[in-house]
Amino acid sequence: MVRILTKKSFALSALVAASLMASGAMASDKTEPRNEQYKDKFSKQYNSWHETSESVEITDALEQDPNLVILWAGYGFAKDYNKARGHMYAVTDLRNTLRTGAPKKDTDGPMPMACWSCKSPDVPRMIEEQGEDGYFSGKWYKGGAEIVNTIGCSDCHEKGKSKLRISRPFAERGMEAIGTPFDKASRKDKQSMVCGQCHVEYYFEKTADKKGFVKFPWDKGTTVEDMEAYYDAIDFADWTHKVSKTPMLKAQHPGYETWQLGMHGKNNVSCTDCHMPKVKNAEGRKFTDHKVGNPFDRFEETCGNCHDQSKEFMVNLDKERKAKVKEIQLRAENQLVKAHFEAGAAWKAGATEAEMKPILTDIRHAQWRWDYAIASHGVASHAPDEALRVLGTAVDKAADARVKLAQLLAKKGVPQPIALPDISTKAKAQAALGMDMKKMNADKEEFKKTVLPKWDAEAKKREATY
């Protein structure tokens, strides 16, 4: 029997079909990377997340502390290192930094695809589409037109839901390595684990089967000594230091690891308790504030939930802890800078690899420990005791290297102390290393003018098909 549809029944059928299509699309597990797609259903969270754009100031860490240029000599961070800004700037700042160079095609540039891995919900989208082998292969340029949505909703939440998720397979493997699989964790633990997808120490693998993959070095544990032992066991180095020829380790931002060791972590005060508290909007409705930031900016909703001291007291206590950490940090830097130049002098004087090996091991371990402490941005607040302990061992190991160097330099007939170049400013330190900053900056400006518009146009065309 043939059924004749009236206008009314046809319209109703079309409406039902459209509804089913929409429901089917939302039911898909595929990552939706476009953050604006969530602004209606989760308006309060979306609007507060968007306020991370207010951290407009760019703070040049190399300008503030020129020692860093020498400590990272031969590595990208000696070119450019700004303090972190809000999540809204994750993609922008990675595009603009000198560390990513000025590539003109997908085979150019100093950095691999893995450098995008914590910057965008486009990353899990690409991994879903291409697999990890496809995503991690190639240079950073390859992801330019694909990775355009900054850190947002789908990085931490299942599609269209408030339910938390880990969106990176490498992060899942990391959590499993330390016996805390995400699917078995409590919601309270998950609130920190989603942050631990990115606010962690990681490295890029160099094995043939997983070259360029991101991995957390947690196989032996998550302390500074555990990860140091792991890296030593696999003979891993991020780069060779330009002055001392030390096989170096570059710590990333082990916030999750250091948080666990502090009083907040030990009492299971989560990342969100302090950095994304529950707040009330103008209508009095509670929601999770996604303007990730300083707990002191929302003291009553964060610190005030547990502490009965005043905001002034807590702020001053935090300042005191930061000052103590900074003091030992600078002591470690002073020892390390001298050790690098003294090692360089030893090589020039004819030192052998056998003579230098124990010295370079001390420098490697000292700088790794220093970097582990300072790269964890909030360590003075999260785990001040651990920060001071680790920095103290960095000072000791750097001093051990310098004692051995003094003996070796004397043996080689080299007058001491070794003359050091003027590194009192960022520019002078970079010049001392022979870095052509004028060319690097000019190349980057050309890249921003010619390549970035091309990436954005390609991305817009692709997203129009979603």
Swiss-Prot record:
Predominant localisation class: periplasm
A GO BP entry: anaerobic electron transport chain
EC number: 1.7.2.2
Residues annotated for heme c 2 binding in this entry: C153, C156, H157, H290
Signal peptide: 1-27
Cofactor(s) recorded in Swiss-Prot or TrEMBL: Ca(2+); heme c
Cofactor binding note of this UniProt entry: Binds 1 Ca(2+) ion per monomer. Binds 5 heme c groups covalently per monomer.
Binding site for heme c 5: H264, C303, C306, H307
Binding residues annotated for substrate, in chain numbering: Y202, H253
Tagged with keyword Amino-acid biosynthesis: no
Keywords assigned: Calcium, Electron transport, Heme, Iron, Metal-binding, Oxidoreductase, Periplasm, Signal, Transport
GO MF term set: calcium ion binding; heme binding; iron ion binding; nitrite reductase (cytochrome, ammonia-forming) activity
InterPro entries according to UniProt: Cyt_c552, Cyt_c_NO2Rdtase_formate-dep, Multihaem_cyt_sf
Binding site for heme c 4: C271, C274, H275, H382
Residues that coordinate or bind heme: C115, C118, K119
Pathway(s) this gene product operates in, as recorded in its UniProt entry: Nitrogen metabolism; nitrate reduction (assimilation)
Catalytic reactions of this protein: 6 Fe(III)-[cytochrome c] + NH4(+) + 2 H2O = 6 Fe(II)-[cytochrome c] + nitrite + 8 H(+)
Annotated binding of heme c 3, by residue: H87, C195, C198, H199
Residues that bind Ca(2+): E201, Y202, K250, Q252
Subcellular location(s) of the protein: Periplasm
Function: Catalyzes the reduction of nitrite to ammonia, consuming six electrons in the process.
Similarity annotation: Belongs to the cytochrome c-552 family.
Name recorded for this polypeptide: Cytochrome c-552
